[in-house]
Amino acid sequence: MSNKPTVSIVLCTYNGEKYVREQLDSILKQSYPIHEIVIQDDNSADGTWDILEEYAIKNPLIRIYRNEGKHGVNPNFLSAIHRAEGDYIAISDQDDVWEVDKIANQMSCIGDKMLCSGHSRPFSTDGSFAYFDGRKRNVNIFRMMFLGLP
């Protein structure tokens, strides 16, 4: 048995059928062992739930939950986070695609710190990468975590 800390992946979905397969495939390919994947759907009206059920049947690490009504992004994530059982929680948006070593890299850096983040490479729906002009943005990570995006 490994002494590595356990990592729960938490993601929330809402009408994400266009992206959720690629996202889940990238999470399932992580080089660091994943304890569980907790997915909470916010009552999607497209085929998202069917895709989630398909993945949950194939992979026992995946636990899926569906809201009866639409709760919104922050309450949905808060509820999903409370369901997670791992030592650490990694949050994923429904259109994220992770590099295979994302969790391994973060776990090698976190040590006794409370929070660890990684670099991201935003890309458009056609797959081309977006670049920014280097200006500092007024972003408060704790505000984003607890209150939502600015």
What are these regions (language model features)?
Residues 1-150:
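Nucleotide-sugar donor-binding/catalytic module of glycosyltransferases
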